[in-house]
UniProtKB/Swiss-Prot annotation:
<protein>
    <recommendedName>
        <fullName>UPF0235 protein msl4154</fullName>
    </recommendedName>
</protein>
<comment type="similarity">
    <text>Belongs to the UPF0235 family.</text>
</comment>
<dbReference type="Pfam" id="PF02594">
    <property type="entry name" value="DUF167"/>
</dbReference>
<dbReference type="InterPro" id="IPR003746">
    <property type="entry name" value="DUF167"/>
</dbReference>
<dbReference type="InterPro" id="IPR036591">
    <property type="entry name" value="YggU-like_sf"/>
</dbReference>
Length: 102
């Protein structure tokens, strides 16, 4: 299974499948879709209105990976379940933290 991320010069892009309106906020590991792409499964309590679920996802990823919330942002898939989250920081260290979640 491939890692659910892409290494960038100044960080990583993390591919996430988000489920809003969950009973709790959590990252649930790596999943592979039918087309063979990997993504990290995430659940948040926030509702998908006015970007609340995206903001909750950004906070959850920042807390889980131990990075400042300001270095995490949803850059693609704002209204979709499948999102790309950009995390600024040391790419190798971030990749290791994500792989440990798998």
């Amino acid at each position: 299974m491939s890692a659910p991320l892409r290494i960038r010069e100044n960080g990583i892009d993390l591919f996430v499948r988000l489920t809003p309106k969950s009973s709790l906020d959590r990252l649930e590991g790596v999943e592979t879709s039918a087309d063979g792409r990997s993504h990290l499964k995430a659940r948040v309590r926030a509702v998908p209105e006015n970007g609340a679920a995206n903001q909750a996802l950004e906070r959850l990823v920042a807390k889980t990976l131990g990075v400042p919330a300001s270095s995490v942002s949803v850059v693609a898939g704002g209204t979709s379940r499948l999102k790309t989250v950009r995390i600024v920081g040391d790419p190798e260290a971030l990749a290791q933290r994500v792989e440990a979640l798998g």
